[in-house]
Amino acid sequence: NKEILTRKFTTPLTTAANKLYNVTEFKAEDLSSGMDTNLRAYLLSEYDANGDGLLSQAEAESVTEIYSTGFGGKVKSLMYIERFPNLEVLVVNSNCDELNGITLSNNKKLTRVSLSPANGLWSSLNVSGLENLTTFELKFSNDQANLSKINLSNCPALKKVVVEGAKSLETLDLTGSASTVEMFWLQSCPKMTTVDIQEMPIN
């Protein structure tokens, strides 16, 4: 009847529906969810454009640079870093000595990766297939580093490779990457016996 048709709702429709179907209140997607606490705080401070305490898809796509100077403490994990498809620069220095795992092969726009000290890294590091990567720097500061393999294959724009203090490093794969390297620095890596640098343009 007319009374029902003209009646105003005093309870928001979404709230009423939630009660009817016994579901929790809908929340917008947060692409910073589950990330390392200090890294998440940094991302929200730099890229949360509307200040709602969440990272929307659009805000995640605006992330192009991550610098450790903005972190409030140490970063133990870079899990979910693949959520930022436009990330170009990743620099985590002095805050990542407990960093234990990282995969960057899905961040296709990366041009620079710098991690120091990365003492907690696991046995292997995959940075392969990054067509825009020009600079890779990885440094360790103690004798307990367990990293034994670095995969830098198929990075055709690579110009600078720096690896220091990787006491357990045995394999550095530069297949499909070596021909463009202009600076290659390998220091204090006693278990590293062979590196194929035939493609490198070294005089």
Language-model-detected regions and their locations in the chain:
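Extracytoplasmic cysteine-anchoring/structural motifs
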Residues: 1-31
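Short, surface-exposed linear segments at secondary-structure transitions and domain or protein termini
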Residues: 12-23, 87, 110, 133-136, ...
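N-terminal capping/linker segments that flank leucine-rich repeat
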Residues: 29-108, 126-131, 154-156, 167, ...
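Conserved hydrophobic beta-strand positions in leucine-rich repeat
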Residues: 64-69, 90-92, 102, 111-115, ...
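Extracellular beta-strand-rich, repetitive "passenger/adhesive" scaffolds
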Residues: 72, 93-97, 115-120, 138-146, ...
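Periodically patterned hydrophobic/aromatic "hotspot" residues that form packing/interaction faces
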Residues: 102, 125, 150, 163, ...
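Beta-strand-rich extracellular passenger or scaffold domains
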Residues: 123-125, 146-150, 171-172, 195
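Intrinsically disordered, low-complexity linker/propeptide segments enriched in Ser/Thr/Gly/Pro
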Residues: 138, 144, 172, 180, ...
